[in-house]
Amino acid sequence: KCMTKLFNIGNKSSLKNANDLRNDLKNKSIIVVDDGSATGSTLIAAVRYMRKNMMPKRLIIALPISPKGTINKLKSEDINHIEVITGPQDNSFVSIEQYYRNFDQITDRQVFDIMERNLK
């Protein structure tokens, strides 16, 4: 049900579907997954929006890579748990891309297709 609403939001920017999704996620655990967080700015904005508008019971962040300084910045936000696979020292970190063999960008459609296949 939520996957369908996410798909509709992504394709139609439907305010009604966004409101339905917000109600479906209230008091539930939300896991936010990103390909990495260099500065934390996007995740912080997302966390603050979700806390204010979706009111989740728990908010969990999962990242394969994020420098230690960014992880510490994220820890100051209202996040229940942060899971990071690799947290390099700030002075050795250049970009998220340096930790991937292939960092090609994928489309929203590709993400929704993958999620739909794996949720069936």
Predicted regions and their residues:
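A short alpha/beta connector and helix-capping loop motif
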Residues: 43-61
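A generic local structural motif
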Residues: 16-20, 47-49, 69-71
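Secondary-structure transition/hinge residues
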Residues: 10-14, 54, 119
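PRPP-dependent phosphoribosyltransferase catalytic core
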Residues: 1-2, 55-120
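Internal catalytic-core helix/loop-beta-alpha segment
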Residues: 1-44
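Amphipathic, alpha-helical segments enriched in basic
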Residues: 21, 25, 49, 86-90
